Amino acid sequence: MRLSRYFMPTLRETPKEAEIVSHRLMLRAGLVRQEAAGIYAWLPLGLRVLERVCAVIRREQDRSGAVEILMPTVQSAELWRESGRYDAYGKEMLRLKDRHDREMLYGPTAEEMVTEIFRASVRSYKDLPKNLYQISWKFRDEVRPRFGTMRSREFLMKDAYSFDFDQAGARHAYNRMFVAYLRTFAGLGLKAIPMRADTGPIGGDLSHEFIILAKTGESEVFCDKAYLGFDIPPATVDFDDVAALQGIVDAWTSHYAATEEMHEPAAFAEVPEDSRMAARGIEVGHIFYFGTKYSEPMGAKVAGPDGIERPVHMGSYGIGPSRLVAAIIEASHDEAGIIWPDAVAPFDVALINLKVGDSATEAACAQIQSDLEAAGLSVLYDDRDERPGAKFATADLIGLPWQVIVGPKGLAEGKVELKRRAGGERESLATVDLLARIRRV
């Protein structure tokens, strides 16, 4: 893609309304634009990141055995009255009426909707277990939306819902998602620590938040440093192996880790002093087991082996892709701009032409772009007639993993310059060696 033809409205100055690093950089790099309080338009560069984040989430959800669906955003108020949450949810829920005066709502979550879908379709324990997930836009009318897409009113959410015949099956479903989440965040270039959490308005008996550590995190967390060295479950993990999954969950919950709300100073004091860590953290995922909280009042039942109908046991599992984009930036940036992990970068390579109009330089850039794209790499070619300094600043700001810098002086020696954005290392090499060098990382 040529930058001269792309839509990437960057900003030189930091917008006054941006309070945290990710919000500032998302606006300056042209990822998003605010359209109303807590509501953002995703521009081409930001949308590419969002789609890559969703691709990693889908890969791990599918691998765990979850099945994707898509539910309507506008829901009937009657479903929420069945569960008892319509009046309890509060002003965060956007309520509306259609032309026939029927009460509707813009879904902030979908437990009721998915329970209704399940109860209309599944009748026997033989059809269990089931885990259904979607990636869709939600709306919560926050009193004070802030921090850009970190705490917006409209947000993209991956929400999954498991249905099992009994508590043992539901716990296995919970463990599946626990392990899938560990792999998801690792696949996004993040080290997430699961922490016991409050169940909040969703309710239930068991809940974990997945927290990444960041200096600009929104809340304080407390944990054992041992978590930083834990190995991520491999791609070969067997999600049907109950004992293996339980072993992974036990290992990842055996040390102290708690959010500020669940923190127990006395228990934390038992952690060896040199292993204690109090830091700022950002919630990037939340999983819940809530038993029959929704299935009981909504009549989501299946017949067991004895023919008796029983309410199914449920869990829900959320990851916010739009929030994750901001969280990744909070965890990976420097003074010059964003540093995207390879897995989610909008493009793999920033190709920088130092002398637009020079036939040799333009021919070399065209060939490099063609070769890299033929090898499966995505390239953003800066062919603008701008000063080199401005091009370097733009490349650092948008944070693509690699920068390939092409100019007449280097080409005279048959070489180009390659820069790794994450560490800032630069090296001069022959164009024929470029692809092999990039792939070595």
Curated annotation (Swiss-Prot):
Catalytic activity entry: tRNA(Pro) + L-proline + ATP = L-prolyl-tRNA(Pro) + AMP + diphosphate
Q: Record keywords: rRNA-binding included? A: no
Output the Gene Ontology terms for molecular function: ATP binding; proline-tRNA ligase activity
What's an example GO BP annotation here?
prolyl-tRNA aminoacylation
Under the cellular component aspect of Gene Ontology, which terms does the record hold?
A: cytosol
InterPro entries named in the record = aa-tRNA-synt_IIb (IPR002314), aa-tRNA-synth_II (IPR006195), aa-tRNA-synth_II/BPL/LPL (IPR045864), Anticodon-bd (IPR004154), Anticodon-bd_dom_sf (IPR036621), Pro-tRNA-ligase_IIa (IPR002316), Pro-tRNA-synth_IIa_bac-type (IPR004500), Pro-tRNA_synthetase (IPR050062)
Q: Which UniProt keywords apply?
A: Aminoacyl-tRNA synthetase, ATP-binding, Cytoplasm, Ligase, Nucleotide-binding, Protein biosynthesis
Major localization listed first in the record, in broad terms: cytoplasm
State the PROSITE patterns in the record.
AA_TRNA_LIGASE_II (PS50862)
Where it sits in the cell: the answer is: Cytoplasm
- Name the domain of life this protein comes from: Bacteria
Its EC number(s): 6.1.1.15
Q: What class of enzyme is it?
A: ligase
Q: How does it assemble?
A: Homodimer.
Family stated for the protein in its record: Belongs to the class-II aminoacyl-tRNA synthetase family. ProS type 2 subfamily.
By its UniProt entry, which HAMAP family does this protein fall under? Pro_tRNA_synth_type2
Q: What does this protein do?
A: Catalyzes the attachment of proline to tRNA(Pro) in a two-step reaction: proline is first activated by ATP to form Pro-AMP and then transferred to the acceptor end of tRNA(Pro).
Q: What is this protein called?
A: Proline--tRNA ligase
State the organism of origin: Methylobacterium radiotolerans (strain ATCC 27329 / DSM 1819 / JCM 2831 / NBRC 15690 / NCIMB 10815 / 0-1)
